[in-house]
Amino acid sequence: MDIWFQDETRVGQQGSQTRIWAPKGTRPRIVKQQQYLYQYIFGAVCPKRQDCAGLILPQVNYDGFQKHLEEISFHIPQGRHGVVVMDRAGWHTKKKLSIPHNISILYLPPRAPELNPQEMVWQHLKDTYLANRTFSSLEDIVDACSNAWNAFSNSKKLISSLTTRHWIHLI
């Protein structure tokens, strides 16, 4: 059995600002955009297998989440079962949701994002790749999200260090 942690985050022109190094006595300038173009990254990680599954979509809704469940299902090896841990967002709890045969859903308690290691992934991606920058178009946002997600997903050591918790006991 594999435990997967799933979540979504928004990335766009109203991005985040983070601290940066600057010479002593200077104030660095950071551009803040006024436009509102954005995309969402749907992401899931499996700390035990150091694997992840992600999609970049224009909105969060039932259809996008259904596609993400199918993507997670694709990443689960034949003969294994995945327990996907997630919050109770409205699109996660629809009755018409078609859950793949190799996945079970486990919902986190309300208002407990600290129990989802995927939140650390978002913080890392935003701090390292997506903060303190501007985006000229939707394609620019998608490219930046793709580059950030690919850099993360190609580093098994980073997946492990950001998402492994001592309280995750796997079968």
Language-model-derived ranges and their functions:
Residues M1-I171:
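Short functional hotspots at interaction and active-site rims
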